[in-house]
Amino acid sequence: MAGSDTAPFLSQADDPDDGPVPGTPGLPGSTGNPKSEEPEVPDQEGLQRITGLSPGRSALIVAVLCYINLLNYMDRFTVAGVLPDIEQFFNIGDSSSGLIQTVFISSYMVLAPVFGYLGDRYNRKYLMCGGIAFWSLVTLGSSFIPGEHFWLLLLTRGLVGVGEASYSTIAPTLIADLFVADQRSRMLSIFYFAIPVGSGLGYIAGSKVKDMAGDWHWALRVTPGLGVVAVLLLFLVVREPPRGAVERHSDLPPLNPTSWWADLRALARNPSFVLSSLGFTAVAFVTGSLALWAPAFLLRSRVVLGETPPCLPGDSCSSSDSLIFGLITCLTGVLGVGLGVEISRRLRHSNPRADPLVCATGLLGSAPFLFLSLACARGSIVATYIFIFIGETLLSMNWAIVADILLYVVIPTRRSTAEAFQIVLSHLLGDAGSPYLIGLISDRLRRNWPPSFLSEFRALQFSLMLCAFVGALGGAAFLGTAIFIEADRRRAQLHVQGLLHEAGSTDDRIVVPQRGRSTRVPVASVLI
C-alpha cells in the first residue's frame, strides 16, 4: 500500500525535500502542456466500484450536505435579520452588537482544528450528527434568554460554533471523495450555492417570522427543528466513502494519515494553500461585515432620506431592508457562484491558473462597487442597492473556486485539517473581528459628532468603507496564488498516485539503485 510506513516506495528527485516537481512549467522534463499533466478521470462505473455508491446515492448525499449547509448559514444570519430588535431588547450599542457575531466566529474558529483533526481520522458522518444535534439544542435555548442577561446570549452563540465546526470542516471532503475533476467542481458549486441562499433566507426568515409572531425570539426557534431533520437525514442517507480512493483510481485502501504536526508543516509549505486562504480571509472580512451591518446601514440610510421612521425604543423596527438585502444575497450568491465556476471551468482548459485569476478578478472588481454603494447611500437608496448587487455578485464568484483549489493542492488525508485551518485563518483575520471592528469604529466616530440620526448613518458609512480596501488586498493574494498553483497541484497529484512521498521524521531510509536512479526505501521494508 502506497501510504504505508513499512511498504517500499519511491522517493526520487521530485520529493519536496530533494528537488522540484517534474512536469512543472519552466523546469527540466516539463512538457509545457497542462493538459498532459491531468490524471485520467474514472467513469461513472469506475466511481461506483471505488466508492461502493451508485451515482444516484452520491448525488443524494450531496443534496443532504447542501441542505445542512443552507441551514447552517440560515441560522447564522437570522440574528442579523433581527439585529435592531436585539439591540433594543438587550439595550446595547453597535460594538456590543458586533460581539454577537464575533463570539460565534471565535468559537467556531477554535473548534475547527479539533474537528479537522478528527475528520481526517474518524467517521465523518457521526461527527457531523453529534455536532448538529448539539447546535440545534443550543440555538433553541438561546431564544429564551431574558433581557438582563446579554452575556448568556453571547455564550450560547459561542456554543453554536460546535455544530458549524463539525460540519464545515468535513462536508467538502466527503464531496471530494465522491467525485473528481469537472464533476467535483459542479458538485462543489451546488454545495456552495447554499451559502448565499442560506444567508439570504436567514434575513428573510428572521424578519418575516418576527413580523408574523410579533416577537423576534421566534426567529431563533425555526432552525432547531430543521436541524433535527438534518441529523436524521445524515444518519439514514449519508455513507462514508474511502478517503482519496477516487483520485488514486483504484479500490486499494485509502492513504494512511500522517501525524498532525507533519500535516501542519506540509500545509505551511504549500504556498497555494496559504495565499488562497489569505485571499479567502479578505472575502470573509467583507462578507462578515456586510452580513451583520448592511441591513442596519440601509435602515439608517432610509431614515436620513426620510423614507422610513426611525427605530425608537419600545417600537418594532422596520424589517423591509432585511428582506430586500436577503433577496439580494440569495440572487447574487446563486449568480456569482455559478458565474465563477463556469468561467473558471471554461478558462481552465487553456489556462491552468484560471481558478486563482477568476478569484482575483472577483475581489478586485467588487471593491469599487462596494465603495460606490456606500458613497451613494445618502443620495439614492436605489443606486445603493444596484451597486450592492454588482459588488456581491463579484464577491460570490470566490466561494466554490477557493474550495476546489484547496481540494486539488492538498492530499486527501490532510483535507479536513486544511479546511479547518483555512477556517481558522479566514475567521481569525476575517469575519471573527470585522463586525466588532466596524461597530467599534462606528461608535468612536459618533462620539465626535452631535447625537443625531445623520451622525449614526455617517459613522457606519465611513466604517464600512474599510471593506473595499480589504477586498483589494485579497485580490492581490489570489494573484500571488496564480504563481504557485501549477506546481502545487502537480505535487498533490503525484502524492495521491503513489509517485511522491514525504520522509517521516522517524523513518530511516536507505538508498537502493534502480535503473540508474536512487530509490529511497524504509529500512523496515528491507529487513522484512
Swiss-Prot record:
Keyword Isomerase: no
PROSITE patterns: MFS
GO molecular function: transmembrane transporter activity
Subcellular location: Lysosome membrane; Mitochondrion inner membrane
Classification via Pfam families: MFS_1 (PF07690)
Disordered: annotated segments: 1-49
Residues carrying Phosphoserine: S518
Protein's UniProt name: Protein spinster homolog 1
Native source species: Homo sapiens
